[in-house]
Amino acid sequence: MSSPQKDIYLIIGGSGFLGRHIVEKLLARGDVVSTFDIVQRYHDVPFYSGDISEENQVSQAVQKSAATCIIHTASPPHGIDDPALYWKVNVDGTQAVINAAVANGVHKLVFTSSAGVVFNGEDLVNTDERLPPPEKSMDAYNESKAKGEELVLAANGKGGLLTVALRPSGIFGPGDRQVMHGLSQVFERNQTNFQIGDNNNLFDWTYVTNVAHAHLLAADRLVPLKHLSEQETSQIINYYLPTVSLTTGSRRQPTSEARPLGPYVVPPPHAEEIEARFNNPDPQAQYTSISYPPPVVRSRFDPLSDAVIARHRALAAINSKEKEAEGPIPTDPLQVAGQVFFITNGEPTYFWDFPRAVWRSLRVSSPSAPSERRRITFPREVGLVLAYAAEWWGWLVGKEPAFTRFRVTFSCVHRWHNIEKARRVLGYEPEVGLEEGVKRMVDWWKAEHGMKP
C-alpha cells in the first residue's frame, strides 16, 4: 500500500512574522515550501512577489510552486489607521487566494484568522467557537478578519478545496516587531510603572511557534469528511486532557481522593499509589493504575456535548442541501474541514503580568535602567477619557495616536478562550510555555539590538 502523497506548500505572507516560523517548521520536517509576499526577506525557499489582491498574480505563484496546500497568513499589522488596506488584503486578497486555489486545483487552504473576530469590547471568559462575530466589530482589523474567515469557510468544498480557519490570540515571540517593539518603547521611556485597570482580567497570549505548530496540524488533518463511528467519536471527546502546565508545572488537585492533604489518620486502600500519582510529573502516568482514564463529564451546555455535536451536524446537512453543489459541503465539529479553532497557549494570565515579565527581563540586562518605581494605577474610566483626548489630539495634528480607547479596553477586559476543540480535533498541544516564550523573545530582542544577554 503506497503512502499518501506529501503536500507542496505555498505560504502567503511567508516573509512575515508568523509566516516565517511556519516556513521554518515545514523545512525542518523536510517539506517542499515556497512563499508569496510583497518583500523577500529570506532566500532559503523559492519566493514569488506579488499583490495578494491581484488574483492573476496569486494564481501564477500557485502554478509555479505547484502548491497543493496554501497557508494564508498575510495581513497588515493590527493598529494602523487604514481600513481600506485591511479590506484590500484581508477580504479582497483572501477572495483572490480562494479563487486562485480553486482555479488551480489546490486541495487545502489554511487561513490565519484572529481571536479578535469575536471581540466586541466586553469580557470573553472561556469562550469557545460557538460564539459568532458581533454585528459591530471593535475595529477595522477584526471586521476584515471576520469577513475573510467567512469567505474561507464558505469556500469549503468548492472545486475540491478543503478549508479551515485558525484564531490565534496575542501572538508573540522572536521576530515580532509589534508587541515587543511597543513594550520596549515603554521600557525605554521609563513608563513601566503606569497601569490601567485593576489587573484582575485574564488574557490569552500565544507563543509564535505554538501557532505555527497549529497551522501544520490543521494542514495535515485537513482531509475529506468521513463517517465517524461511535467508537471513533468517543476516542476524540472522551479521553483525559491534562491542564496545560508548561509554565506553572503540574499541581496536586484537592479531589476527594486526595484528601486529607496532610498525613493520613487511617491510610485508605491504594494510599501509596494515590500519593505517587499526585507526585508524578507525567500527567498521563498518574492514571495508569487507578480509574484510567478519568471520566469526562459533560453537560448539555458543553461545546462538545452529544446534543451540541448532533445539532451542528444537522444544521450543516441542511445548509449543504440548500446550497447544493455550490458549497459549503457538510461539516463535522469533530473533523477539521470547514471549522474554526481558537489557538492559545492555554495559560491565560493577568494582563499586566505579561508586559512586566518582559520589562523585568529587559531590566536585568540594562544596569543603567532605572529601578522599578511605585506603581500608578488609573481606573478604566479615566484611561478611556485620556485615550479619547489622545485620539482627538492625534486627529488635530495629523498623527496616529499610540494611546487609544481600543487599547484601554483591550488591557482591562477578560479575553481568554477554550482550546479544547483544538486539542481534541487538531491534536494541538502548546510546545512552549509563556515563561520560556518571554525569555526567548527577549533574548532575540537583545541580540537584535546589541544588548547584553
Set out the residue ranges of the language-model regions.
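NAD(P)H-binding glycine-rich loop region in Rossmannoid oxidoreductase-like domains
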Residues: 50-92, 96, 100, 117-120
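Non-catalytic, hydrophobic alpha-helical segments
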Residues: 166, 211, 215, 343, ...
